[in-house]
């Protein structure tokens, strides 16, 4: 029906090809890309839709240091990289609208006439989006007189028999193109969620087949494009008509049918021409004439150096790691390209890099002479593995000048394996020439010299390695990984490779470049020393260069003090904690595992009995069927995923009380999760040499500044459930010692009282009242002595819920009360604690103005999402803004307490006390029982006075043989 537009024949150039651009990458041969057998994937991006969606999803405050707004182009780039990673296409294309009227405007002058002109900040980013596409070697199509949808329709039609076509877009216009070989991949919420539409998914969402989408718009219209449709016919009626008659043509053919109500018949007859015109306007044209060669679509080799330069210019530092991972789809071609690029890194221009691998005594002596004159150096260790307790040392690299570094090839096994003993931590008499490599002995005075400032990346690992050889690094001044984290705590991308790209615009030799991949992957020990030397020198060189970039940034942002006074001093404490480890009662856990297996099996049988059939309680798909089909439980208010209604724990909590099976499933999930994560796994983590578990503490994971731990994750062992307490009971003191716990009392609430300067909350703490009972009394308007246990429980939930930025919805779920009750409690809470309300409002307002929130110590968390137009994203950022100053201050206090207590122990009780664990507000020590009474008040005093607040800080102390069976001291 396109003929209704009276377009001139295409060969007379009524539709002109105004722009087509295909960048050519000289480093890649396109003919190697196409797999010969299976259909290749073609990703075709709807540029304008992605740009518009991104602009409205991300805050307009996303700007470069030069003030260029980049929110739309950032979202556009992020979604393109995500789609490429997910689908690994062999072919790609980008379609953009051309400025000016289209054939649809000629047919209907009011086409898109109701659209409000977009902000100039959006239009300014379109050339940047095109630049991104070109730098990624994606061909760009813009055709005069047509929309991007028509270009997409034409290309996928040409390729429907040759490729699996995936249209990547931000709207639903292209759903009409879906068929067995054409799918649509679109954002479903903001930029974080996506969904792929095949024929079944379109029918599931709209109740119509893809080819009926045009028919639907012809009847219903499309307000976003000002397509009129049939006035008076809504979505429901349009769907019903099409389900009965399939097409608009058939609707009119059967206009006198009894199945069409008189009122609807009248509307259809009155607006017949509007329906036909709307049909034409909504139809994506699939026969645009323009020169087309499918070889131009082939994707693979783009110039990463140029791409990295552009990403750095736009300050897309968080996207750089994804850029590294974006490559060609064909495995053989990818392998060839990767090998060639890896070799090129090892043979970079030697005039630029002065890298030296030292293997002879003569060269070492020359190097050592230079080394002793330095006042600052970067160092890095190369090891046989990533476990600092068991790995052998392969060498040390050192740099003190840009593009210059030295690698000392030292093949040294750890001393405990040489001695054949099992005491990893008693090597003070082993630094002799009989046990240590002579170069290590020569390096020891330099590395232990405080006057020579040291720089490292993830210094904790390198220091732990060197401690195996009784080399104790002194003068550690800078850790590039931690510095990058302090500058951008929300990134979670702090590898040396990533930081080199972000800050130096330099692509490092990666671990894969060095070791290879697949079955032929080498171990570090097997890498030729020449290659290992280049790799190691580069690590030290990059670390040194990063220091020169990151230190000024820390100073400019007034964050250097966080590094100097908290994070760097904490490293020694964490190393001692990790090396100390903690004992585990493995037989007890084995017994607990058997009990759990019986309980889990019992729950499973009970669930099967209720449903009258066997099913897998861990399968989301089977749960969906059982809950919503078999048992007909209402799914109203539950989130949806790509596979249907979500059966995640948070969603199932919304169904609590609706059916007996919900509680069973929740209990089953908790038991199976804790069984697999802790009960079965913990014994496997026992170090065979020490007989203890050695967790690793992370300083660069939590955006608030909190520490986290892995292998095992101690922070996630629940304390309030019976099973959680049973798991904690497995952590025990070694023979002849006891565990002593020092736990801050309600620290977050005390910090909140101080920061908000709330008189009622401060009064409660100063008078030693139970703050939860006080809150219960205030919000329920009853005397303290009339507060019930249930009132206190709800008040406790509210006290902490407010600190975590919870609204009535969240509070209703956590407190197990109605939305109305939750809103009433929040109103009463803010009426009682007026300054807490003031703190919440002012913190959010200030965060929107500055782009960040900060702790009492000045640690910053950047939250640009506070200005997001998407309400869900914005509300989430507001919750983070409210919580971060409190939780972040708490984290800083705990870290300072650890530093001071560790120093106190080292000076006075190093052979009788070991700090083992830090979990939230609690520190756990292993102590000689004879000194517990002596040291308890001293450690409490240190912890309670690490900072002065306007309310008292109190610490509770307990002792016992395991982590749970403790008694108050």
Task: Explain the meaning of each model-derived region.
Residues 209-212, 216-279, 290, 594-618, ...:
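Accessory alpha-helical DNA-binding modules that contact the DNA backbone or grooves
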Residues 41-43, 47, 53-91, 109-121, ...:
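Conserved RNase H-like, two-metal-ion catalytic cores of nucleic-acid enzymes
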Residues 25-27:
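Cysteine-centered motifs
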Residues 598-605, 609-663, 831-879, 883-885, ...:
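C-terminal polymerase-core module
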Residues 36-40, 166-168, 174-211, 401-404, ...:
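Charged catalytic and DNA/RNA-contacting regions of genome-maintenance
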Residues 35-168, 172-199, 274-277, 283-291, ...:
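Noncatalytic, basic helical substrate-engagement surface that gates or grips nucleic-acid strands
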Residues 271-430, 438, 491, 503, ...:
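Conserved "right-hand" nucleotidyltransferase catalytic core of DNA-directed polymerases
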Residues 522-525, 579, 687-690, 694-695, ...:
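Conserved catalytic core of nucleic-acid polymerases
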């Amino acid at each position: 029906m396109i003929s209704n537009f009276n377009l001139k024949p295409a060969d007379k150039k009524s539709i002109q090809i105004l722009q087509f651009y295909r960048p050519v990458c000289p480093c890649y041969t396109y003919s190697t890309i196409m797999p010969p057998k299976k259909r290749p994937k073609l990703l075709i991006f709807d540029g304008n839709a992605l740009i518009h969606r991104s602009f409205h999803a991300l805050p307009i405050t996303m700007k470069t240091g030069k003030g260029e707004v980049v929110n739309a182009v950032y979202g556009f780039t992020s979604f393109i990289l995500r789609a490429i990673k997910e689908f690994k296409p062999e072919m790609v294309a980008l379609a953009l609208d051309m400025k000016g009227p289209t054939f649809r405007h000629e047919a209907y002058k009011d086409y898109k006439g109701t659209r409000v002109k977009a902000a100039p900040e959006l239009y300014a980013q379109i050339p940047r989006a095109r630049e991104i596409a070109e730098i990624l070697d994606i061909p760009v199509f813009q055709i005069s007189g047509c929309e991007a949808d028509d270009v997409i329709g034409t290309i996928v039609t040409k390729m429907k028999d040759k490729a699996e076509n995936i249209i990547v877009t931000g709207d639903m216009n292209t759903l009409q193109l879906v068929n067995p070989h054409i799918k649509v991949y679109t954002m479903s919420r903001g930029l974080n969620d996506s969904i792929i539409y095949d024929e079944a998914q379109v029918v599931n969402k709209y109740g119509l087949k893809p080819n009926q989408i045009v028919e639907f718009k012809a009847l219903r219209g499309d307000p976003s494009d000002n397509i009129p449709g049939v006035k008076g016919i809504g979505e429901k009626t349009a769907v019903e008509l099409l389900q009965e008659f399939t097409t608009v043509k058939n609707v009119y053919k059967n206009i006198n049918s009894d199945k069409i109500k008189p009122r609807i018949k009248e509307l259809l007859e009155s607006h017949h021409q509007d329906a036909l015109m709307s049909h034409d306007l909504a139809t994506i044209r699939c026969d645009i004439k323009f020169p087309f060669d499918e070889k131009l679509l082939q994707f693979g080799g783009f110039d990463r150096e140029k791409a990295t330069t552009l990403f750095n210019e736009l300050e897309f530092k968080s996207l750089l790691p994804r850029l590294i991972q974006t490559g060609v789809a064909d495995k053989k071609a990818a392998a060839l390209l990767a090998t060639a690029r890896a070799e090129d890194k090892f043979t970079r221009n030697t005039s630029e890099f002065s890298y030296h691998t030292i293997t002879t005594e003569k060269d070492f002596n020359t190097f050592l002479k230079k080394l002793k004159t330095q006042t600052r150096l970067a160092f890095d260790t190369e090891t046989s593995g990533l476990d600092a307790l068991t790995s052998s040392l392969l060498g040390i690299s050192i740099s003190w000048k840009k593009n210059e570094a030295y690698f000392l090839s030292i093949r040294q096994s750890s001393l405990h394996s040489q001695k054949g003993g099992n005491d990893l931590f008693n090597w003070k008499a082993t630094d002799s020439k009989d046990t240590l490599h002579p170069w290590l002995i020569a390096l020891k005075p330099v590395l232990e010299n405080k006057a020579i400032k040291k720089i490292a990346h993830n210094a904790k690992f390198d220091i732990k390695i060197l401690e195996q050889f009784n080399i104790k690094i002194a003068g550690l001044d800078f850790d590039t990984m931690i510095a990058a984290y302090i500058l951008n705590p929300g990134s979670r991308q702090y590898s040396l490779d990533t930081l080199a790209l972000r800050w130096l615009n330099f692509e490092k030799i990666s671990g894969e470049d060095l070791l290879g991949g697949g079955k032929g992957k080498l171990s570090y020990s097997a890498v030729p020393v020449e290659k290992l030397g280049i790799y190691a020198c580069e690590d030290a060189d990059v670390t040194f260069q990063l220091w020169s970039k990151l230190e000024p940034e820390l100073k400019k942002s007034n964050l250097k003090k966080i590094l100097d006074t908290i994070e760097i001093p904490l490293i020694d404490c964490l190393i001692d904690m990790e090396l100390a480890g903690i004992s585990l009662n493995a037989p007890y856990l084995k017994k607990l595992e058997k009990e759990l297996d019986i309980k889990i099996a019992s729950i499973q049988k009970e669930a099967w009995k209720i449903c009258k059939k066997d099913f897998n309680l861990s399968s989301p798909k089977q749960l969906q069927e059982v809950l919503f089909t078999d048992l007909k439980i209402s799914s109203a208010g539950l989130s949806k995923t790509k596979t249907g209604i979500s059966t995640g724990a948070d969603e199932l909590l919304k169904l609590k009380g609706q059916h007996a099976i919900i509680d069973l499933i929740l209990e089953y999930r908790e038991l199976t999760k804790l069984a697999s994560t802790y009960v079965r796994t913990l014994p496997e983590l026992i170090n065979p040499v020490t007989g203890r578990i050695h967790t690793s503490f992370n300083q660069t994971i939590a955006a608030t500044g909190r520490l986290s731990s892995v292998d095992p994750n101690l922070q996630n062992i629940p304390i309030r459930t019976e099973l959680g307490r049973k798991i904690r009971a497995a952590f025990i003191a070694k023979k002849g010692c006891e565990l002593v716990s020092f736990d801050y009392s309600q620290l977050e609430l005390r910090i909140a009282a101080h920061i908000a300067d709330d008189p009622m909350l401060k009064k409660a703490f100063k008078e030693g009242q139970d703050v939860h009972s006080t809150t219960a009394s205030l919000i329920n308007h009853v005397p303290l002595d009339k507060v019930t246990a249930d009132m206190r429980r709800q008040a406790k939930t509210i006290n902490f819920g407010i600190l975590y930025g919870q609204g009535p919805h969240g509070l209703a779920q956590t407190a197990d009360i109605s939305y109305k009750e939750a809103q009433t409690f929040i109103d009463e809470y803010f009426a009682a604690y007026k300054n807490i309300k003031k703190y919440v409002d002012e913190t959010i307002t200030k965060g929107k103005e500055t782009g960040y929130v900060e702790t009492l110590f000045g640690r910053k968390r950047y939250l640009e999402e506070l200005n997001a137009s998407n309400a869900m994203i914005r509300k989430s950022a507001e919750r983070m803004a409210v919580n971060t100053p409190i939780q972040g201050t708490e984290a800083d206090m705990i870290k300072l307490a650890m530093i001071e207590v560790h120093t106190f122990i080292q000076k006075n009780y190093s052979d009788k006390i070991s700090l083992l664990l830090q979990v939230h507000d609690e520190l756990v020590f292993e102590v000689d029982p004879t000194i517990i009474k002596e040291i308890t008040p001293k450690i409490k005093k240190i912890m309670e006075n690490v900072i002065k607040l306007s309310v008292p800080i109190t610490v509770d102390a307990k002792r016992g043989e395991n982590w749970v069976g403790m008694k108050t001291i």
